[in-house]
């Protein structure tokens, strides 16, 4: 973690900036690599070791925006390896339910069976995966580990109006078929298994064409196949810090405002240019392409300040995805701790 010096009261601004910031210049990125060795700065009086109490004081999570399927929040006081571990867990290690087996009874459409099966597998299923078990290999399907959906669509032409009926097979045509006591598992209508969206196109049909399919959903994780990933995107970026020299005023200030495609800068009443909307900055560096501005505008990112964006497929809420990722991360830490204890003992 990015720690303050504990061995003296004097801080070297250049060294502190190197430890805590990533700098972007016209020619590239400087100081991108973090230094985590505890004794890296001992010779100049900095204690770079991890301190649990200091971590507890500095660590923060601030929610910037939240809806059922989208979550944007700040995580302050952690290093990139931890942030990236959480991101990877959200993408590939949180289980969901997805169509795994497809039994094609009839398919007279022009789409090949294997392509149709693949399309069905990529439709996100709205159901809480925590209510189901992982299916064991070579075992029969049970209500505890499998969901069954029926897809039966026939395209016809109305003899009176000439209108084509069921011209497009949609995800809403996937009908859940309860087995054993599954209806008791979902007493509320809104909780019952269904495709996340009703209007996902599966395929086009012409009059007389029929598809009759049984789909079996199983629980698994995104590391096995991306169809089991609970997120559309899970990403993070570092907090931007943009500073502008006070000498930029008048016409130069207006030129700087015009250079930024995201309109990050504003001019205050005093004539001073400020970065009013730093979170909108995409680090395109257009503002420092001109040598005239390169020396007067400084673009940095805070090394331990992450802005996470999570977009759910709908199987789980974005908040639940992050909570599950934390649980899995703790389990992994416990495994490492147990392994180390075995080696030591």
Curated annotation (Swiss-Prot):
DNA-dependent RNA polymerase catalyzes the transcription of DNA into RNA using the four ribonucleoside triphosphates as substrates. Common component of RNA polymerases I and III which synthesize ribosomal RNA precursors and small RNAs, such as 5S rRNA and tRNAs, respectively. RPAC1 is part of the Pol core element with the central large cleft and probably a clamp element that moves to open and close the cleft. It is found in: Nucleus. PANTHER family: DNA-DIRECTED RNA POLYMERASE (PTHR11800), DNA-DIRECTED RNA POLYMERASES I AND III SUBUNIT RPAC1 (PTHR11800:SF13). Residues 1-11 have a biased composition (Polar residues). GO terms for biological process: transcription by RNA polymerase I; transcription by RNA polymerase III. Component of the RNA polymerase I (Pol I) and RNA polymerase III (Pol III) complexes consisting of at least 13 and 17 subunits, respectively. Interacts with RPAC19/RPAC2. Pfam families: RNA_pol_A_bac (PF01000), RNA_pol_L (PF01193). Belongs to the archaeal Rpo3/eukaryotic RPB3 RNA polymerase subunit family. The keyword Transcription applies. The keyword Thylakoid does not apply. This is DNA-directed RNA polymerases I and III subunit rpac1.
């Amino acid at each position: 973690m990015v720690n303050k010096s504990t061995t003296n009261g004097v801080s070297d601004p250049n060294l502190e900036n190197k430890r805590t910031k990533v700098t972007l210049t016209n020619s590239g990125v400087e100081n991108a690599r973090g230094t985590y060795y505890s004794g890296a700065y001992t010779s100049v009086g900095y204690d770079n070791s991890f301190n649990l109490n200091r971590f507890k004081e500095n660590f923060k999570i601030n929610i910037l925006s939240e809806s059922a399927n989208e979550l944007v929040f700040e995580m302050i006081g952690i290093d990139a390896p931890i942030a990236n571990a959480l991101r990877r867990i959200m993408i590939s290690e949180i289980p969901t339910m997805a169509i795994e087996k497809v039994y094609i009874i009839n398919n007279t459409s022009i789409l090949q069976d294997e392509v149709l099966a693949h399309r069905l597998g990529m439709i996100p299923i709205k159901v809480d995966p925590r209510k189901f078990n992982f299916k064991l290999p070579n075992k029969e399907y049970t209500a505890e580990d499998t969901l069954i959906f029926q897809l039966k669509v026939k395209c016809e032409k109305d003899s009176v109006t000439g209108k084509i009926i069921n011209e497009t097979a949609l995800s809403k045509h996937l009908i859940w078929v309860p087995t054993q006591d599954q209806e008791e598992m979902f007493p509320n209508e809104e909780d019952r298994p269904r495709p996340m969206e009703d209007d996902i196109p599966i395929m086009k049909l012409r009059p007389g064409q029929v598809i009759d399919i049984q789909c079996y959903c199983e629980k698994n994780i995104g590391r096995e196949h991306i169809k089991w990933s609970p997120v559309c995107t899970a990403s993070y970026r570092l907090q931007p810090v943009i500073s502008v020299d006070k000498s930029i005023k008048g016409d130069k200030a207006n030129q700087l405002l015009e250079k930024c495609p995201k309109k990050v800068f504003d001019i205050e009443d005093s004539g001073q240019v400020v970065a009013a909307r730093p979170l909108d900055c995409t680090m395109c560096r257009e503002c420092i392409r001109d040598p005239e501005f390169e020396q007067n505008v400084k673009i940095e990112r805070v090394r331990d300040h992450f802005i996470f964006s999570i977009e759910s497929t709908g199987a789980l809420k974005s908040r639940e995805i992050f909570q599950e990722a934390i649980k899995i991360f703790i389990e992994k830490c416990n495994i490492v701790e147990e392994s180390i204890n075995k080696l030591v003992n």
